[in-house]
Amino acid sequence: MGAQKTIAYLAIIAIAVIFAQVNTAPPVGHYAANNTNKSHNLVVGYRMPGDRLVLRQSVIKNSSWGRIVVEERTFNVSSWERITMIQALDQKTNGNGAYASITNGGPGNQNVTIRLKSQRGHGINFVIEIYSRY
């Protein structure tokens, strides 16, 4: 009888410990649940030692009431360089920013064409950064 009580007691403690560990674990996707920054950044490629920032340019277009604003820009690097990484950083952090996409070129090429499309009734405010290497 004493052994059965001891086993039951240990089973209850084991269950309590398991529930305590499950309940204290951080929620899955905690970073994604953090809604403080809702920017629509585009990052393509990756940097390696020896890469350098060859272009940093702001792209700003005012909003047009009830309309979608589209801006398409082509960026080039010198003929002996290749693009390794492109960052289109949305400066609006409230979720009203534009969306960036690459329509031509990109990492491994000497040029890239980026299309920026705003949400209806909002403008465009991006910083474009291009990294390359020889």
Swiss-Prot record:
Entries under InterPro entries matching the protein: MBF2
GO-annotated cellular components: extracellular region
Pfam families for this protein: MBF2 (PF15868)
Keywords (A to Z) from UniProt: Secreted, Signal
Subcellular location: Secreted
UniProt keyword Secreted present: yes
Signal peptide: 1-24
Electron transport recorded as keyword: no
Protein name: Probable salivary secreted peptide
Source organism (scientific name): Bombus ignitus (Bumblebee)
